[in-house]
Regions:
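Conserved ATP-binding subdomain of kinase catalytic cores across diverse folds
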Residues: 1-89, 101, 105, 116-117, ...
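Helix-rich C-lobe and terminal helical cap/extension of kinase-like folds
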Residues: 29-33, 74, 83-105, 132-254
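Hydrophobic HxD+1 residue recognition
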Residues: 122-126
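Hydrophobic residue at the +6 position relative to the catalytic HRD Asp in the kinase catalytic loop
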Residues: 127-131
Length: 254
């Protein structure tokens, strides 16, 4: 049944891509999505992921990943340490300064894992982050993760550095090398920079940034609304299959 649903999703993605994003390799993206979903249903694979993150963050001052009990776990059963923590509704009632700390910890975990482990959790969902009494945040659910090669991470750093320096030509070149821009000569570098800053500038700016609902809606608009000033640019861009989970992590984090 799952394979049938995923095959139908692939068909829908291909049809949508032809109309909305001709540059997108929808079959490759659907294949990546299928692989990650099937991994998420395999609890033995999830246990391997969770053990890797638990080892990496063992003793960390503000990040906690529960230990997996391998002898009690099976392909369809995953047992780990019990965590006492607050839910997201409790987080929303915290004072602003405490919410800022909570948000910073999650940001550092999500993005820091990429650069420190070459491995990140793509399932960014508020139910997976539990503030603990000692000030740490517990991170749960490692069924959907993604590993990146050092070369890919280096290319992403090039793109972020170029955006931070406002070097539009270098940004266009880096995004071409990553596979986001197939034909750089057809994409104006300055417009591409403006588009990237509107969508991802919140984590490229070296200052405190407040993420408001209005800012999030603007990000959605410039990437998906045909009436957007950037929609013609979006149609010339692509989404490499290897970048799908990274973008999922970013949007979920927002």
């Amino acid at each position: 049944a799952i394979d049938t649903d995923l095959a139908e999703l692939r068909s829908i993605l291909v049809r949508l891509a032809k109309a909305l994003a001709p540059g997108l390799d929808a079959k490759a993206v659907a294949g990546e999505l299928r692989e990650r979903v099937l991994e998420e249903l395999d609890y033995e694979y999830e246990a391997q992921n969770q053990r890797a993150f638990a080892r990496a963050y063992d003793g960390h001052p503000f990040i906690y990943v529960p230990k997996v009990h391998s002898r009690l776990s099976r392909r369809r059963v995953l047992v780990s340490d019990y965590v006492e923590g607050e839910g997201f509704e409790a987080v929303k009632r915290l004072p602003q300064d405490e919410r800022d700390i909570y948000g910073e910890i999650i940001f550092r975990f999500c993005f820091g894992s990429i650069y420190h482990l070459q491995h990140f959790n793509a399932d960014t969902h508020p139910g997976n982050y539990l503030p603990m009494e000692d000030g740490r945040v517990a991170f749960l659910d490692f069924g959907m993760t993604k590993r990146l090669s050092p070369d890919q991470i280096q290319l992403e750093q090039r793109a972020i550095d170029a955006a931070g320096r406002d070097d539009a030509e270098a940004l266009r070149e880096a995004l071409h090398d990553l596979g986001f821009v197939a034909n750089p000569d057809r994409v104006e570098a300055e417009r591409l920079m403006e588009h990237v800053k509107m969508v991802g500038g919140w984590y490229m700016e070296d200052r405190e940034v407040q993420i408001t609902p209005e800012r999030v809606m603007k990000m959605v608009e410039v990437t998906s609304d045909p009436r957007s000033d950037f929609f013609d640019l979006v149609r010339r861009e692509s989404l490499p299959a290897d970048e799908l989970m990274g973008r999922r992590m970013e949007t979920g984090l927002l």
